[in-house]
Amino acid sequence: MERNKKIVFFLALALLWTTAITVACLVDMSDVPAANVENIDKLAHLGFYAIFSILWFLYLENKIESTPKLFLIVFMLSVIFGVFIEFCQSTFTANRQADVNDAIANTIGATIGLLLMAIYTKKFKK
């Protein structure tokens, strides 16, 4: 894919995913049937933030030359966004509340996503 199209493509995906997380975490979910699986919400947070960090990595790798700096920026972006969403849940919603365990799951998910990108980068970007 042409470099500029690739940049726009990954930016669009990252923004769409960020919007999807925001909506999913801030809307009233009390009418949604709950899965009868223990800690399913934590697994969802892991998945959301693994994908979040991968998409932002794929966009920002075209903007940031230094690989360690890229990993640090994407990690910090993921953590800050996750904490911001938890803050918004406790401040701006009536049916949602902040949960430290969600923030931890977000951080673990972001770390998993970045570990996958480290493997990808090492294997395919020599």
Model-derived regions, located:
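Bulky hydrophobic segments
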Residues: M1-R96, V100, T107, T111-K126
